[in-house]
């Protein structure tokens, strides 16, 4: 895996891109993004869904719609990683909509765009909801 996708490129999506660029090429999709961010390739939804790992970085109020909209378009073996600030609700949504052959890693970032900019030290709580292909271990170490 040499690239990852990010759906949602607001403040937190940009922080994710900064963190992940150290090890991956980044593809991003956002309805409102201008498509300009150093080192990020902006693609349409169809192309972002080809990535093996996709981070969902949308506001919680849009989370269920995004997950339900993409669920039927995901290929077997893809892993979805959410970065919502709450856990029960996103996990329930992902388990409800995502096929059994799609991995799920629920995370709770212990930083935000402002705190990351001040100390540049990301820390995440992670829940191995549905691990496929040992993705949880990989991302826990990253």
Each language-model region and where it sits:
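ADP-ribose/adenylate-binding Rossmann-like module
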Residues: 74-90
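Active-site beta-alpha loop architecture of Rossmann-like, nucleotide-cofactor-dependent enzymes
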Residues: 35, 61-64, 87
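Rossmann-like NAD(P)-binding element
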Residues: 45-73
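NAD(P)+-binding Rossmann beta1-loop-alpha1 motif at the extreme N-terminus of oxidoreductases
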Residues: 1-44
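Rossmann-fold dinucleotide-binding core
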Residues: 86-142
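Hydrophobic/aromatic beta-strand patches that form the interior of the parallel beta-sheet core
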Residues: 27-29, 43, 81, 105, ...
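Short, conserved loop/helix-junction motifs that constitute active-site signature segments
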Residues: 71-77, 97-99
């Amino acid at each position: 895996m040499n690239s990852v996708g990010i759906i949602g490129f607001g403040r937190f999506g940009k922080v994710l891109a900064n963190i992940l660029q150290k090890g991956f090429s980044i593809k991003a999709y956002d309805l409102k993004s201008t498509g300009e961010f150093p080192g990020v390739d902006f693609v349409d939804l169809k192309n972002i869904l080809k990535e093996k790992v996709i981070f969902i970085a949308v506001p919680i109020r849009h989370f269920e719609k995004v997950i339900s909209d993409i669920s039927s378009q995901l290929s077997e073996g893809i892993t979805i990683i959410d970065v919502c600030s709450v856990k029960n609700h996103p996990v329930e949504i992902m388990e409800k909509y995502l096929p059994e052959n799609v991995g799920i890693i629920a995370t709770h970032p212990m930083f935000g765009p402002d705190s990351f900019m001040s100390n540049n030290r990301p820390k995440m709580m992670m829940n191995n909801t549905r691990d496929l292909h040992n993705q949880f271990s990989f991302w826990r170490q990253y």
